[in-house]
């Protein structure tokens, strides 16, 4: 899909070439529109962004959904975390759940992606199934957690958040 002027201005957050440091300019690229360009390297510089995973963690025995509270905030959200350089997103799902909750994922299902502009991050949402919560032990990133039946999870997740949109889309597809 071609870039529009507004999108180019957003992409021009990256003002300098990541290889040589030269100031980027806007340049037309056939089939793409206006794209950031390094005149020294003579290369187009497509936008760089973070990649993260967000998980709807489901207990296979009870059907409950795990929601967490983090960083002193008062609302429940989904377990999430950044994908490491060179890491597959599917691996990041299991790693983040293991790091934050101690639980081992038995299987995952990809749901959808959404770009989260405030942190310049492509969020990849998955459903992650755990056999039970006997391994559950949170790390320092999690203040508290709670298992919810699906409808209760929907009522308790942070309103107007990307986590809520992911959970609602998952729940709506389950109907």
Question: Positions of the model-derived regions?
Answer:
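Unchanged
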Residues: 83-107, 112-169, 174
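Short glycine/serine/proline-enriched coil/turn segments at secondary-structure junctions
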Residues: 47, 75, 117-120
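Residues immediately within or flanking Cys/His clusters that coordinate Zn2+
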Residues: 14-16, 35
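Conserved hydrophobic/aromatic beta-strand scaffold that supports enzyme active sites
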Residues: 16, 56, 67, 125-127, ...
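A broadly conserved sequence feature marking short terminus-proximal activation segments
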Residues: 1-14, 166-174
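Short, intrinsically disordered, charge-biased short linear motifs at domain edges
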Residues: 1-8, 17-29
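Conserved Nudix-box catalytic region and its N-terminal flanking loop in Nudix hydrolases
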Residues: 6-7, 56-99
